[in-house]
Amino acid sequence: MKRSEKRILTTHVGSLVRPPELSRYIEAIDNGVKVDQAAFDRSLADSVADVIKRQQQVGVDIVSDGEFGKFRSWSFYVLDRLGGIEERAVEAARGAGRDQQMFADFYAEYFPTQKLPKRGTVVCVGPLTYKGHAAVRKDIEIFKAGLKGAAVADAFLPVVAPASAVPRHKNEYYKDDEEFLFKLAEALREEYKAIVDAGLMVQIDDAFLPYMYDVAFAVDQLTISEVGGGPHRGAQSRHRRLAGRPHPLSHLLGQL
């Protein structure tokens, strides 16, 4: 990570608004529609190069790829990069969290605008492994190609934290959820390593951290002390993922 003694270097959380053409491709992919792969790859590469230039133009020092290559959303993209899991038919929802209950009118208007594809229930059925080497390599190559000639201080790729990767899952293989979470951390560490080894910063997004409290209080009626174990295990799993990684090349983001 670059340091500055003259001023504070600027950055952002990582995700940026996708251009319309790229959004149409990703919406089609998310809904299982076959697209022209070569045309999509060109659109993705052009979009990443353009968003890097736009960040530079507005004065952002530490830029990202906008998370443009994460098709299934900022967290669900990783499901295509993991072995040992499968998706099954959607089960009944657990219920709305406290925030959704308090602002029901807002969410009633918000959700229909998001065009979210239907998600199945994520089930762990075997040993968790990482199989996304080609995908993360593509992320890196497209990002680094877009960075050529860019006058920026540094660059980072956002990735999902273990606890946020599959926040609503069923575990049918490991002895308990704690073992599941730590095995997931070990698998996802390979994605971290690939990014850091490529000379880029890696950002860990754990946006489901506040959601854990929101749902636990409103739906499960748990106390603060009872909820605390989940975030604590999530933090431990992140540290395990970072084992052997240079700390200056990584940072944690809990989006509130």
Question: Predicted regions: what is each one?
Answer:
Residues 1-256:
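Domain-level signal for soluble alpha/beta catalytic cores
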